[in-house]
Amino acid sequence: MKIKVKLPDGKEKEYDRGITPAEIAKELGIKKAIGAVVNGELWDLKRPIENDCELRLVTLEDPEAPEFYRHTMAHILAQAVMRLYGKENVKLGIGPTIENGFYYDFDIKNGRLTEEDLPKIEQEMKKIIKENLPIERKEISKEEARELFRDQPYKLELIEEIEGNRVTIYRQGEFVDLCRGPHLPSTGIVKHFKLLSVSGAYWRGSEKNPMLTRVYGTAFAKKEDLDNYLKFLEEAQRRDHRKLGPQLELFMLNTEYAPGMPFFLPKGVVVLNELMKFSRELHRERGYQEIFTPLIMNEQLWKISGHWDHYAENMYFIEKDEERYAVKPMNCPGHILVYKSRTVSYRDLPLRFFEFGRVHRYERSGVLHGLMRVRSFTQDDAHIFCTPDQIEEEILGVLDLINTIYSQFGFTYRVELSTMPEDHMGDEAIWEKATTALKNALERAGLSYKVNEGEGAFYGPKIDFHIRDSIGREWQCATIQLDFMMPEKFNVTYIGPDNKEHRAVMIHRAIYGSLERFFGILIEHFAGAFPTWLAPIQVAVIPISEKHNDGAEKVARRISQEGFRVFFDNRRETLGYRIRQAQTQKIPYMIIIGDKELESGKISVRTRTGKEIKDVDPEHFVETLRNEVLSRKLELSMEG
């Protein structure tokens, strides 16, 4: 029987049913093929093709290639661990690819792997790569799979969850794994890898299950790419907010008494207050009204909103006086209550409510991560209530606000629009009108965007913003979400020109997203060296010796009177030590006062990067600092 295969150049060829991509690659003279994409699905090079299809061969240069070779590298890792620690002592979890790498989970009898074990595992992996073992894909019955994995309890659990009676396994030498693929044709194709770290991970992510050992690694087709990625990781580690935050006395974490709930220290509160001040200024200019809603509200509110049915496991509850309350996980129901506290006319719209709202959401302890994944956080939440005809202009206003805020920190960003899913609520005509309004606003703002068809929330289309930091990482932050569900549930209406009630449109939006998470991103983006307007201490005044204290204190007082944050460092430490401390604390400016400065009335300024400017008029410095802070410059003015 023949099948038709359509190739990337548009040509259609006939082949015998069961032909493999490897055979097609040979016919086409493509010697470097490592796999294929068949009807959009990643496909092993030696896997038979049974039906008509579109086919594109994959080489190591193609964007799909990492999925093949990193998946295979995860199997090589598992094979190496089983060789080193004994098949009878190693129970296998799962070993998927992840962004920029892979991992495998192990349950090892009488012990756990540590990072000291990684070098010897790497050596064993190199042996397996050198052996260049053929990798074979095979479909077997569940009964055969149960027998094959009879000593692997985690695999047996997975087998039972697979639909149908057939499962896929992969074999390389003596190693066999339950896997859907895809994989390389053999173990020797990609040689450039590195094991990165070891951590604990609960089986299936549940704390009720055993704790396994997770080994992370990465792999690249070229050594140069691997080396560059390892340098990137080193730089990311240097910027890690979990390390810099405590070092710079910005925040602390206490996992014993408040896991996932950061404590902000005085210097960290300065930064948070500056972030909120900046945001408030922009919101006031754009007609937002700031409100403040309760932290705890009756359970009935959350039943109406739907959180009770769909989000209860992530909420915290309190029972008092035979009434049950919930600590709010979101701000929207509270904002709706404010809206509904009076009759709203179409002439009042749009109404823009804004709040720095503290919310609490339960997260498993295993996924908590510094300020990036917490249980208690503050959202810069706003809800816009408007008519359907006002959607486009309101979205355009939000887009401008987002651009203004992100530009202030030097972030570039990309935009994604997610549209109506199959299981949507509400009238399709309303969806169409709303989606068109979002597209029009994006285009009027001059923003290019990617459309994720069918990936919107069931209650409305949304726009997501992914900011790019100074070392190229992306963070999803701002969201603009149209909501057709909450106005229905809470009967959110306005009185129209016809003196009748009409359903209002509700737009959710956050820009920082989580204030705590955005703070963490900024720490890493700036490597702790905040622009002067954000810096907890803006100027350190350092007398050279005790006899210079009085003169230096006058300088410190003068600068402080102008509203700047000044640290007068007259500690009985060496001058070099105090300068190094100021640099370690990443204070933008240091003023050094000695005999020469006291005699001349001038000051010597040193920036945190080490640049020295002598004979500076104090008033000129104050004016320069004022302009730098008021304009919220990213760079230090005196380094220009």
UniProtKB/Swiss-Prot annotation:
A single MF term (Gene Ontology): tRNA binding
Keyword check for Protein biosynthesis: yes
Gene3D superfamilies: 3.10.20.30, Anticodon-binding domain, Bira Bifunctional Protein, Domain 2, Threonyl-trna Synthetase, Chain A, domain 2
Annotated residues for binding of Zn(2+): 332, 383, 508
Domain TGS per the UniProt entry, residue ranges: 1-59
Family: Belongs to the class-II aminoacyl-tRNA synthetase family.
Subunit structure, as described in the record: Homodimer.
Annotated function: Catalyzes the attachment of threonine to tRNA(Thr) in a two-step reaction: L-threonine is first activated by ATP to form Thr-AMP and then transferred to the acceptor end of tRNA(Thr). Also edits incorrectly charged L-seryl-tRNA(Thr).
The name this protein goes by in its record: Threonine--tRNA ligase
Source species: Thermotoga maritima (strain ATCC 43589 / DSM 3109 / JCM 10099 / NBRC 100826 / MSB8)
Classification of source organism: Bacteria, Thermotogati, Thermotogota, Thermotogae, Thermotogales
Gene: thrS
